[in-house]
Structures are given as C-alpha cells and as structure tokens.
C-alpha cells in the first residue's frame, strides 16, 4: 500500500468516526425531533423470529449504526456487558430475550420505535403484545435453520393482527448457510408470496457483500465495523443470476400488483421507482414479502435493511386501527381512529405491557389517537379510574427519557397507573370506547411451588403478585385437594425463569415440583337435563327448575365453554339467568373424572320453572350446579390433553434414533427434511409424554440434537391415560378405585 492510499484509508476511517460521534452527540436533538415528527416519518416496528436467529444482535447493530449506542456488545455477555436490549441479568446470562425491550432511534430523519421480542415459545405472550401495537415487523430467519417452529407461531400472530413484514435472512456467515432454501421454505411452509430483493455475494466464510436487485448495484460494507457502505458494479460472475432473480421478483409482484402486472404483460421493463412503489403497495396489503439478506454479527446488510423499513413498511397513517363504541343495551359499533398528529381528536391509548420498574409499576402504552401531555388526566375505560400523569417517558431498554407530550403513533410509558394488560385509556370519559383486547393463550403446564424458607413468605407473595399482573399467561392458584400452591405457564422454561427471578429479584429461593399437564374434561355427545332444586327448612325456601341440553362444541372450540339462554316466556325470569350461568361456570372449574376443568361444552338453557316467593338467584345457581352433576352421572365424558408441535434437528446419523424416540412417546410424524448432513423431523406429541425429552435427546445425539415445541391443540387422550388419571384422582379423593371405572361412560 502506498503512503497516499494509506492516508486516504486513515482519513475515511477518521471521517466515519467523526460522523458517528456527531450522531451520538446530537441524539438529544433527535429526541426533540421524535416528539414532533411528521406522521410519514414514523415507523413502529417489531423484530420477531425463532430463538437464536439473531434478533437481539440485529437490534444491537441497528442501534449502533443509527448512533443510539456508542459501541456494540455480544448477546451472551462474553464481554461481561451483554446486549443493550437484554436489560435483565438473567437475559444476559442465558443469551435469550425474555421481555420485549422497547427503544426508539433515528435513521435518515425518520423516528423508528423498535420492540425486540423473545424468540422462545414459552414467552409467546410478549410477542403477541408487541405485534398488537406495531405497524410493521422484521421477520428474522436463520440461513441455516430456516423456518422453524416459533417462526410458524410468529407468522400466525402477524396474520392475526394483519402486520406487514419484511424478511431478513441472517447469519450468511455460518457454515451451511443457504438463503435459497430458506426462501423456498417461506413459500411452502409460511405460504408467503416472497422473493429476493437482495442477493448474497458469497456465503459462509466467502460472504463479501450483497447485491441490491432493485437498484442493480453491489453493496460492500467496509472497515471492521461495517460503517462505510460502498456501491459498485455487480460482479461479473453474478450478473446472470441477478438478472434471473430480478425477473423473478417482477414476476411475483405482477401477480399481486396491477401496475407492474400491466408492464409485465406488455413486456416492458419497470423502472427502479416502479418496482419500489409496487413492493411498498403489496407489502402493506400483505400480498408480497420482500426478502433481504445479511449477517448482523459480521456487520453486513444492516443499513440497507433500515432503508427497507423506511421504504416498504407503513407509517401509522397507513394502518387501520379500530375501536369499539360500547353503549349499554346496544351492539358495539366499530369506528376508525384518527392517526393525525395534530392533537385535534381526543386521546386514545392501549396498555400493552406492565412491568415493575425501579420507580414503581411501569405501563407501556401505544397512542392511537390525539395527544397526551404531562399533567393531563386519563381514564381507564374498563375500571373508570382517573389518573393524573406526573411523568411521560420514552424507553431505551431499561433507561428512560422524560418527554412533555406524545402524539398518535408514539410508544411510551407511564408510572403509577393501576391497570391490566389490554386496557384502553382516554382523556374524555364520555367516549365509552375500547380497543380490541390482546389475545392471551391458556397455560398448558402447572408446577407445585413453595418458598424454600418459611421466613420468605412475604417476599414470595410480593413476587407472585407482581409477576401475575405483568404476565397474563403466568397463573397462580391454591389446590385445596392436594393442599399445594400451583403456578401455571406456557412451558417448563417459562416457570423456571420466574422461579429464578424470585430468587434473584426478591431473595426468595423456591422449590418447584414436577410439571403437571393441564388436562381438560369434555362431553362426547349431547345430554339433556331436567333438574329441580327444592329446599324447605322453615321460613323462605329455595325453588328452581332448569331444563336444557349440555352439548360438545366443535373440536376447534374445545378449550372454551359457552352459555346460551334459549328460554321463551317467564318460566325462568330473566333476572335469574345470570345465576344459572354462574352456577354452570363454577361447576366447569372442576370435573368429576380427574378434577380438571371442563371445556369444549355448551350449556343451552331451554326452559324451567320458578316459585313466586321461594325462587332466587341462589336457588337457580344451585339448580344449574345440580343439572351439571346429573349430566356427570348420565352423560358420556372423555379427557382431553394438550398436543404439542415438536421440531427436532440433529445430525443425519441419529435420524432413526430420534424418530424411534418420538414414536415411543406416542408422537405422530408430520414431516421430515434434510440438508448437508443434518435432518429436521416434525411431529405432534402429547405434552404429557414430552417431559424429560431434552436429556434423552442430548444423550442419544452426543449433545448435538436440538428441539423446540409449541402448543397446537387439545385432543382426546388415550384410554389407558384416561383410566390412570381417573384412578389417581379417585385415590387422591380417598374413594375406592373401582368407583372411578364406573364414572367412565361408554362413548356413543
């Protein structure tokens, strides 16, 4: 290298460093800009993916390149610091993101709010909450692992909340990287109309840069931090492939976009602007998914991804947000919220996450309409409580920055607000409107829990009270039959994390029992009931009669219970119907076969009778309970168990062993695939048969096998499992085992 070229390189590095320092120093002015940014210059995005796909590393790079942090850190805390977005000590140790950290940053005069979500399936509720309040998302896929179980879950969640997304195929530098295979999986498994808008220039150790198919240029990321992005001609050896992939991109767009479709049919070549506009239109409608590539760890492809967020993901004004106006005695009416950032419409916000911070309860909100200023009073629509706001803060991981006001489209946090996740807040209590609530899945695993030392009971109570309020999938109950305290959640890891947090944050070590599956009891066939509750013991008596049908719901509704009032006339006065429903729901809390909840049943109240003096709501509640007991005696019942979707990846030589293990655990193989010495098997396995599988898989694959699982559905359990559950329950109740067999009715 000549002296002049060396000086040029040193000068460019110094310039890049200077630019970065200026970005850091001017971020206070960025915060002021963020408060008053135009609607078109705001993006609310989430970063979602399967565990260990590189989401948190990608977020760390985004924060660095936008000047939000001064230096990058590794995720698993190898540098004793850990990633910025992993603020909890437990997260830094495990190298997984447990809570959705929120932050905001600036890129090319646009304010970007980012939620970094967990990838582990046990923390699915965090992903649900994040997607509910976002306008767009980046779906991160590993170029080796491809589409995995949690990717399918995240994809379903994005579909539920209609969130447009970009796909970013990460980890091009890893051995076995194959972005083309991942694109094929996106089309076949996720049913995405997806195409590359970038191509990698080499993979694994030869990963040099990327080709931008829209601009038809090669991009190289220079110096060891990748700060300088150099444009160049597409390498000669890649031009044929680039032309072919660009044509494929136009073809996929022409299937969903009219303008490009016309140009395609007329065999005209669309311009760069035509393609960008078509990608944006179709991405917003969720009819096309642009696919980008890169490696966050090696600092390649992050800046073009940020450009794509601005170019192809929606601003708050392009997303339809609906609220419900609810008047007593009338059907809820849907209205569109006004996304304008002018403060002319009244404030409407949604609480999507609760957290116990250092200064009290922290409530994360999204402002959907209007403006909220420090010192304003807001009302909780559900509870009617009024709160005056002393502080408004923006979040950067676990750091807070005070702001004076927030506008429609902003994500922010409040202190000292007593509410639940999914509550709607307004400044005008006469509005009587609420946002749709956040979907919360039911827990599938329970464990007995108790403090290791009796002296820690107070801290234990505080921890449980806080965690159950923060996380609606973490449940706490006392079982009077077995005299044990139970916690329930989305998996073993979910409950273990909370146990460790109790010890770490509340100095309260706990003892966890063996995992227990949340079985359910349901009817096999409809069963009629006609029950009279009559009691006379001096003074006013009790008289109530209920008749109707208890029937099973369709399989896709077998985790819910329903009550319908089909009575005509005044045989059952309307003021007593709520008592009947209450009696039914109380009985549904505990079945007679195994002591588990009833689900997948519908109580149809068809007729009854009352007494002018002796009837009361209590009498009808007891009559409903008696009716359910009669159906227990006369109906045909079965026990349901949760079925999990399991994905196992291991070296090919262990394929037979792994499939044998899954068959032994009563699994049904639904698919297999393999590439470059590794295979992946997909199966549906009862959760009750999955305990202890992690250790078995490790020992049988020399520690190389990995698996993940997520809840799929409830299905009838095998006869021998049902028999054992019934016997165990009867023994626990102190009844004769033979009586349990009498409880099991023949299936119709």
From Swiss-Prot:
Pathway: Protein biosynthesis; polypeptide chain elongation. GTP binds at residues 49-56, 116-120, 170-173. Residues 1-14 form a transit peptide. CDD domains: EF-G, EFG_III, EFG_mtEFG1_IV, mtEFG1_C, mtEFG1_II_like. GO terms for molecular function: GTP binding; GTPase activity; translation elongation factor activity. One of its GO terms (cellular component) is mitochondrion. Keywords: Elongation factor, GTP-binding, Mitochondrion, Nucleotide-binding, Protein biosynthesis, Transit peptide. Residues 40-318 form the tr-type G domain. It comes from the Eukaryota. Its main location: mitochondrion. Belongs to the TRAFAC class translation factor GTPase superfamily. Classic translation factor GTPase family. EF-G/EF-2 subfamily. This is Elongation factor G, mitochondrial.
